[in-house]
């Protein structure tokens, strides 16, 4: 099958834009490869950005501690040096190797072509648990949010956060100094979040509504009010809002990856010491892959990324050296 003339064939296409994927993109640029990232979420950073942006990480080399979002921002800044192509809100449905050796990747939006593929999809594609109320779909991408990618857009707004876990509490605390008013709504009296986070929440100016559940959203084009119902007494209250943020957790799965002909062991892609899968030209790194002695840590993913890139480079360019120059001599 011939590639359409308007479709660029990339050297490396990375599936998954979490921390390992971002570092893979940077390293691919260092090897002078054309790189594309395909990410199913609306922003890069994977679970670090989507689930716990304000949490500190302590086991990344060179950082005594680093906020999850700060680490993501640094990785994005590092990656920018080589200006990779980034495709957001695209989930890869099919991945197949054509007769000419080029990989064809079909997403929910378009078709991509690549000489090699590196899968860095973490625990698999994950999607938010949505608010199950009538008419919610019409408010999505307006003022009903499942992700927070820019805190500043909530400045001076009246914001309601639904949820009781770490992410919901984290987002509430991040919004507290920015928003005009922020209210967190949880169906239980006690939060599931870390005790220290809950203590900080209770000592903040954020309003806490427990045990309440949302039962109705009111508004024409956008949500203007939310109706909350007390879990025990069924008493209803109405809150005026500018924005609603939902964090009921996420559901993750390998999804279509299971259908790509890869060797799968316990929901992970089996690779060898070169990060090669059973399909030549397809590699995997980070939490999505497994091998004997595998440890699932961000730090390990950062080590696996260069191995995958260097071997991918040698795959599509047999004249390339497997062992690269040291970065200190390249810039």
From Swiss-Prot:
<keyword id="KW-0521">NADP</keyword>
<feature type="binding site">
    <location>
        <position position="92"/>
    </location>
    <ligand>
        <name>FAD</name>
    </ligand>
</feature>
<protein>
    <recommendedName>
        <fullName>Ferredoxin--NADP reductase 2</fullName>
        <ecNumber>1.18.1.2</ecNumber>
    </recommendedName>
</protein>
<dbReference type="GO" id="GO:0004324">
    <property type="term" value="F:ferredoxin-NADP+ reductase activity"/>
</dbReference>
<feature type="binding site">
    <location>
        <position position="52"/>
    </location>
    <ligand>
        <name>FAD</name>
    </ligand>
</feature>
<dbReference type="InterPro" id="IPR036188">
    <property type="entry name" value="FAD/NAD-bd_sf"/>
</dbReference>
<keyword id="KW-0560">Oxidoreductase</keyword>
<feature type="binding site">
    <location>
        <position position="328"/>
    </location>
    <ligand>
        <name>FAD</name>
    </ligand>
</feature>
<feature type="binding site">
    <location>
        <position position="20"/>
    </location>
    <ligand>
        <name>FAD</name>
    </ligand>
</feature>
<feature type="binding site">
    <location>
        <position position="126"/>
    </location>
    <ligand>
        <name>FAD</name>
    </ligand>
</feature>
<feature type="binding site">
    <location>
        <position position="47"/>
    </location>
    <ligand>
        <name>FAD</name>
    </ligand>
</feature>
<comment type="similarity">
    <text>Belongs to the ferredoxin--NADP reductase type 2 family.</text>
</comment>
<keyword id="KW-0285">Flavoprotein</keyword>
<comment type="subunit">
    <text>Homodimer.</text>
</comment>
<dbReference type="InterPro" id="IPR022890">
    <property type="entry name" value="Fd--NADP_Rdtase_type_2"/>
</dbReference>
<feature type="binding site">
    <location>
        <position position="39"/>
    </location>
    <ligand>
        <name>FAD</name>
    </ligand>
</feature>
<keyword id="KW-0274">FAD</keyword>
<feature type="binding site">
    <location>
        <position position="287"/>
    </location>
    <ligand>
        <name>FAD</name>
    </ligand>
</feature>
<dbReference type="InterPro" id="IPR050097">
    <property type="entry name" value="Ferredoxin-NADP_redctase_2"/>
</dbReference>
<dbReference type="GO" id="GO:0050661">
    <property type="term" value="F:NADP binding"/>
</dbReference>
<dbReference type="GO" id="GO:0050660">
    <property type="term" value="F:flavin adenine dinucleotide binding"/>
</dbReference>
<dbReference type="Pfam" id="PF07992">
    <property type="entry name" value="Pyr_redox_2"/>
</dbReference>
<dbReference type="InterPro" id="IPR023753">
    <property type="entry name" value="FAD/NAD-binding_dom"/>
</dbReference>
